[in-house]
């Protein structure tokens, strides 16, 4: 896998190319979630309490894959539906796969503020985020920062929530991470001076899109 830096729009084109070559979006989501979980496992040789903060889009879908893998491995998993149930088809399918597992589903982040977690997965907002955080996002990012300060290890899926992928602009109240797992290609925010330090260590995972499938930019 080549090291490359692409914008949010270019990443969409790359995913479209993967789908056109027979790698379905659902499989890319599975590969992304499992790759992120593998990096989390490296930090924790033994399972503990895990909070997976999921938005309603495909970033949240990656989070549901992580939650499923962790629950099967013996983690005590809580999923926070920060903005309600998922809205995209692939995220919905992965949310439904949690129903047969011992995963706690929570819709009110305020009840988690006094709880303790070994790790938090930030799967709230993905590469489509821009502008300012809405009140719900501000509250959820505040919860992530609060738990981080309390000692939880924070893994961000693609990027810490509240950062603009293409410019690195950081919204007031954005989340911070110890480790950011991005997929296929790095994004501008991962190297921008104003945002890179909020990502912690950055790892770019292969999700099955071959180099020769990539469009020329």
Which residues fall in each region the model found?
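Hydrophobic alpha-helical context, especially transmembrane and signal-peptide helices
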Residues: 13, 23-24, 48, 113, ...
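YjeF_N-associated NAD(P)HX repair module
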Residues: 2-9, 117-217
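Conserved active-site and cofactor/substrate-binding residues in soluble primary-metabolism enzymes
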Residues: 6-9, 23-35, 61, 89, ...
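Positively charged, low-complexity intrinsically disordered leader regions
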Residues: 1-46, 210-217
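Structural signal for hydrophobic packing residues in well-ordered secondary-structure cores
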Residues: 15-19, 40, 44, 102, ...
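Generic alpha-helix detector with strongest preference for long hydrophobic helices that associate
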Residues: 9-13, 17, 21, 51, ...
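Nucleotide and nucleotide-moiety/phosphate-recognizing core
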Residues: 37-126, 130-157
């Amino acid at each position: 896998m080549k090291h490359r830096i692409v914008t949010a729009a270019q990443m969409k084109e790359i995913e479209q190319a993967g789908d056109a070559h027979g790698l379905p979006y659902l499989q890319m989501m599975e590969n992304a979630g499992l790759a992120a979980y593998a990096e989390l496992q490296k930090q924790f040789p033994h399972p503990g309490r895990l909070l997976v903060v999921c938005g309603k889009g495909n970033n949240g879908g990656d989070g549901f894959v992580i939650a499923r893998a962790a629950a099967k491995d013996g983690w005590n998993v809580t999923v926070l539906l920060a903005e309600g149930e998922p809205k995209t088809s692939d995220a919905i399918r992965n949310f439904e796969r949690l129903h047969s597992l011992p995963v706690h589903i929570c819709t009110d982040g305020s009840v988690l503020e006094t709880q303790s977690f070994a790790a938090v997965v930030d799967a709230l907002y993905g590469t489509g985020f821009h502008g300012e955080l809405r009140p719900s996002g501000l509250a959820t990012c505040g919860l992530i920062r609060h738990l981080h300060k309390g000692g939880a290890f924070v893994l961000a899926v693609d990027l810490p929530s509240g950062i603009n992928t293409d410019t690195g602009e950081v919204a007031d109240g954005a989340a911070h991470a110890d480790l950011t797992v991005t997929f296929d290609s790095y994004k501008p925010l991962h190297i921008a001076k104003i945002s890179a330090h909020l990502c912690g260590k950055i790892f770019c995972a292969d999700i099955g899109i071959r180099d020769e499938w990539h469009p020329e930019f």
